Amino acid sequence: MPAASLTSVRSFVAAPVPTRPAISVEGRRAFAFKGVEKRFGDKIVLDGIDLDVPAGQFVAVIGKSGCGKSTLLRLLAGLDRPTSGSLTLGAEEEGHSRTRFMFQEPRLLPWASVVKNVEIGLTGIAAGQDARQRALDILGEVGLADRADEWPSVLSGGQKQRVALARALVGHPQILALDEPLGALDALTRIEMQQLLERIWLAQKFTAVLVTHDVAEAVTLADRVVVISAGRIALDLEVPVARPRRRGSAELARLEGTILDRLFG
């Protein structure tokens, strides 16, 4: 990565995080699950999920492998349908995409430039001739404006995930669904991406739903942590810690302990 680009990214993520109350959301609803069940054949993956999320909230969903976390996210993103129960979404806002999904793998098109990959996120939105400029603007927000016309193959893993994040955000989604998007990154890159994600969330005020196995990541980023066990919500915990948050603080460690006790107790 060129030195200038690396410097710009690091200066961006290192800037102070804006102060925000621990829980600060608008009165609008982002979505609500009511009695949602999802079966695959005879297997019950989600069993009576009730979850009401206000617009603008950052929710982390955590649990052991196979507990139903990713299935919940797929239902929210419209990639699957519940077997029973209801999922209600808030009113769609003009000029905003409804929900965008970010996966653990960047899933970039190797034959398209970085900026063209980002423009794909405008599919279904009337961007017209502004598409390239909108893509360039969001690439600037993730620190990759100078890589816009390069091929994905020359980017590092962390840079590819920044492109994937830009693609998800270019349409100004109301809800961003994140399925362990940082799981494959090294520790330092992961922290930088966490800071970047938090900064953009604070600026754009979308609703974020992050599926993760990392309890520390959950309490660092989220307003609220939902623990799923055997397809049911075992814990729904607010994170009453004002931002900016100090990693490793006693407050966050205590919350981590509560979550781990529920996961393994």
Swiss-Prot record:
Database matches in PROSITE patterns: ABC_TRANSPORTER_1, ABC_TRANSPORTER_2, SSUB
GO molecular function: ATP binding; ATP hydrolysis activity
Reaction(s) this enzyme catalyzes, per UniProt: ATP + H2O + aliphatic sulfonate-[sulfonate-binding protein]Side 1 = ADP + phosphate + aliphatic sulfonateSide 2 + [sulfonate-binding protein]Side 1
Protein EC: 7.6.2.14
Subcellular location: Cell inner membrane
Membrane topology listed for this record: Peripheral membrane protein
Keywords noted in UniProt: ATP-binding, Cell inner membrane, Cell membrane, Membrane, Nucleotide-binding, Translocase, Transport
Principal place of residence: membrane
Domain named ABC transporter: residues: 31-255
Gene Ontology CC annotation, any one: plasma membrane
Residues the entry annotates as binding ATP: 63-70
Quaternary context: The complex is composed of two ATP-binding proteins (SsuB), two transmembrane proteins (SsuC) and a solute-binding protein (SsuA).
Role noted for this protein: Part of the ABC transporter complex SsuABC involved in aliphatic sulfonates import. Responsible for energy coupling to the transport system.
Family: Belongs to the ABC transporter superfamily. Aliphatic sulfonates importer (TC 3.A.1.17.2) family.
Name this polypeptide is given: Aliphatic sulfonates import ATP-binding protein SsuB 1
Species this protein is from: Mesorhizobium japonicum (strain LMG 29417 / CECT 9101 / MAFF 303099)
Lineage: Bacteria, Pseudomonadati, Pseudomonadota, Alphaproteobacteria, Hyphomicrobiales
